[in-house]
């Protein structure tokens, strides 16, 4: 990618940060003369210094250096402090040294200089090589077991917005409400929060129903790991099949139960026989993981009909066990369950909220991702000035910022789509990625070849940086993305199962011709035969983890699989290559990127938590769709809160764009979208006449 040809690239340089190595920083301030403040940070130093400027407006940065021995071993600012005090006899600032009203931190050192920090780091590194125990080192190789936080006995603490949801649940139940909705964005912690609701009503039998089998482990981990739920036993379909009296047997021993079933478990008479005991019992709390149920209900109904997909592709999708649900049958089974209280969980309840099923008194939580980010920022503002607080003590630490690229496709693809539209094709974007055969073609391998291979190859080449296009950034060749270790594990969302096969074939066949795409291992999880290779979601997760452990980048090819309810912590980039008009399907997909991905490095006396995914990238090749989805979500929020009116809607959109910026490229010029500025409104209109820049 030739940065010299791109106007206003500095906008992108400012926004893209990526993974940040830990740094030692130092500053001086005229309010504490002759003292040097020495600290460390796991975010950009400039960001940390701006937070300190609240207390020291005139501070001047004096020093910045990495707090790293090697990629697996870090040190803290405590090691620098130790050297300054013990080796150089530098005195720490004391409260009595300050005039009244000046903020106190004990990390100021009298007459310390930047050269002293250099000497300290040199001594720290030499001591490490000599295997000395002088300093404390933090290593990922000796890190605390990842299951540490899930050992029974550890009490998990509700975050403020989770506690608010539980309090609202209690009030609603006390007021006689029996059909409740917890609307909270993916990654909120709905399983933990809803089980805390079960505790509050002393529920003996809790039934959790989900459309996705792979979320079972999340529920199991929560029930069996958190000390909060020590009275509960986790049961699943297998346990009920082993013993028809599994529930009664546990209740006789005064144990409470949380039963997890999938919608597939509820389908079919033979399976239902295994659950006779369950259907006889009074369920104290029925938790319906509506996040996934609602998304599937829509995606296999209207989406397949209205987004231009071939109906024959539904059979390919249904071959994948974790995708095959008869929603109507499952819904009927849910109605038969005798539940005292029903709690629906959803991160994308847009259709539900625009209906009449839930009144405002039934909605116990209304949390979007921007709300989590604001809580994260507020916590930092109120706590990071304290000497004993670490950045990772923030309960929201590690929630990534999503940077959104709203790009038009390459020129030849745009022209092809224009031709398709003129011929009467409504969903030209999905049609662009149509393979020669939707079904498996054993004669000509048509399911492994795109009808428009030339155009798609050129699109990939521009993304890769091996070709240029004035309206599309070759972001894989952008230096800040490479330096920030972004785009390591990408997801391509494609319209047909066979599109995944065709993409795999194209990327593999021309691997050596790409500058960057050739470095990726292709993981095809939705192809015509994908179910044979990756039978279970954990097979997919394990494959990606193995690649990351081997320092290999990956591209996962999917249609719908793993895009609702699944967590692949390494995923950091999504390329959206299909049509959809469903805010639910769209958000379910893109928020797969927004999980925390944290590495723990430990020493004998403590640990460091490193954020491996500070930013994610959504690349949407339909700018109009991205803007439309943004507006619809903000409008739905407005309608369902007290914040009505156009001014409030504008404020919400402005805040969303601050938290998750949108970047466009037009005629080799980068723009950050501000929908309230006339220039961006003009560009937005230009994007709405999709692919028009070439005409």
Regions found by a protein language model. Give the residues of each.
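SF2 helicase/translocase NTPase motor core
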Residues: 132-339, 475-484, 501-548
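Long, largely alpha-helical accessory region at the distal end of helicase-like NTP-driven motors
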Residues: 112-149, 435-462, 622-695
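Conserved RecA-like P-loop NTPase helicase motor core
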Residues: 39, 523-641
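Substrate-gripping "pore-loop 1 plus following alpha2 helix"
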Residues: 293-331, 359-360, 365, 370-375, ...
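Catalytic P-loop NTPase motifs of RecA-like helicase/translocase cores
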Residues: 267, 293-295, 351-352, 583, ...
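A short beta-strand-to-loop transition that corresponds to the Sensor-1 phosphate-sensing loop
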Residues: 41-43, 212, 261-265, 290, ...
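Interdomain helical connector at the RecA1-RecA2 junction of SF1/SF2 helicase-like NTPases
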Residues: 341, 352-490
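Non-catalytic accessory segments flanking enzymatic or RNA/DNA-binding domains
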Residues: 1-156
């Amino acid at each position: 990618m030739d940065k010299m040809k791109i106007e206003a690239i500095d906008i992108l340089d400012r926004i893209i940060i990526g993974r940040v190595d830990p740094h030692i920083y130092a500053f001086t301030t005229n309010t504490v003369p002759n003292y040097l403040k020495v600290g460390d940070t796991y975010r950009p130093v400039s960001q940390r210094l701006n937070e300190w400027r609240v207390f020291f407006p005139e501070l001047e940065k004096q020093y910045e250096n990495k707090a790293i021995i090697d990629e697996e071993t870090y040190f803290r600012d405590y090691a620098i402090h130790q050297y300054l005090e013990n080796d150089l006899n530098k005195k720490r600032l004391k409260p009595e040294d300050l005039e009244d009203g000046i903020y106190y931190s004990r990390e100021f050192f009298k007459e310390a200089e930047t050269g002293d920090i250099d000497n300290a780091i040199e001594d720290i590194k030499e001591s490490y090589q000599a295997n000395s125990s002088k300093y404390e080192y933090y290593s990922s190789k000796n890190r605390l077991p990842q299951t540490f936080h899930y050992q029974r006995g550890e009490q998990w603490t509700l975050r403020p917005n989770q506690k608010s949801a539980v309090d609202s649940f209690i009030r609603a139940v006390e007021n006689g409400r029996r059909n409740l909705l917890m609307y909270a964005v993916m990654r909120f912690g709905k399983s933990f929060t809803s089980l805390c609701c079960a505790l509050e009503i002393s529920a003996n039998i809790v039934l959790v129903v989900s459309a996705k089998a792979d979320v079972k482990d999340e529920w199991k981990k929560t029930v069996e790991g958190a000390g909060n739920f020590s009275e509960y036993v986790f049961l699943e379909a297998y346990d009920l099949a082993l013993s028809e009296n599994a529930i009664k047997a546990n209740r006789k021993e005064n144990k409470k139960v949380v039963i997890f079933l999938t919608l597939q478990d509820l389908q079919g008479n033979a399976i239902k026989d295994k659950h006779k005991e369950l259907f006889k019992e009074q369920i104290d709390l029925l938790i319906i993981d509506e996040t996934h149920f609602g998304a599937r209900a829509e995606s296999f109904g209207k989406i397949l009909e209205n987004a231009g997909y071939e109906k024959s592709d539904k059979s390919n999708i249904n071959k994948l066990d974790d995708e095959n649900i008869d929603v109507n049958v499952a819904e009927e089974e849910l109605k038969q369950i005798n539940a005292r209280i029903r709690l629906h969980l959803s991160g994308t309840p847009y259709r539900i909220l625009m209906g009449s099923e839930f009144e405002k008194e039934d909605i116990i939580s209304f949390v979007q991702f921007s709300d989590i980010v604001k809580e994260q920022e507020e916590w930092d503002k109120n706590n990071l000035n304290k000497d004993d607080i670490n950045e990772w003590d923030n309960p929201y630490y590690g929630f990534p910022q999503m940077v959104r690229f709203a790009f038009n496709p390459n020129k030849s693809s745009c022209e092809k789509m224009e031709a398709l539209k003129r011929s009467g094709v409504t969903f030209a974007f999905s049609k662009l990625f149509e393979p020669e055969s939707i079904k498996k073609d054993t004669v000509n391998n048509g399911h492994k070849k795109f009808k428009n291979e030339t155009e798609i190859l050129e699109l990939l080449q521009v993304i890769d940086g091996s070709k240029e296009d004035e309206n599309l950034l070759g972001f894989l060749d952008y230096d800040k993305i490479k330096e920030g270790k972004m785009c390591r594990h990408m997801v391509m969302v494609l319209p047909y199962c066979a599109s995944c096969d065709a993409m795999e074939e194209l990327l593999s066949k021309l691997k050596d011709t790409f500058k960057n795409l050739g470095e990726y291992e292709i993981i095809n999880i939705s192809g015509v035969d994908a179910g044979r290779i990756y039978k279970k979601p954990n097979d997919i997760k394990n494959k990606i983890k193995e690649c990351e452990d081997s320092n290999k980048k990956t591209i996962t090819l999917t249609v719908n699989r793993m895009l609702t309810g699944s967590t692949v912590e390494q995923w950091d980039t999504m390329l959206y290559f299909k049509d959809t008009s469903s805010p639910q399907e769209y958000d379910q997909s893109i928020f797969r990127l927004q999980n925390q991905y944290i590495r723990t490095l430990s020493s004998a006396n403590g640990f460091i938590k490193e954020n491996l995914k500070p930013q994610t990238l959504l690349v949407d090749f339909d700018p109009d769709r991205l803007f439309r989805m943004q507006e619809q979500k903000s409008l739905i929020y407005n309608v369902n809160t007290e914040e009505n009116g156009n001014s409030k809607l504008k404020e919400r959109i402005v805040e969303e764009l601050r938290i998750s910026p949108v970047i466009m490229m037009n005629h080799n010029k980068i723009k950050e979208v501000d929908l309230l500025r006339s220039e961006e409104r003009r560009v937005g209109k230009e994007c709405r006449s999709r692919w028009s820049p070439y005409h």
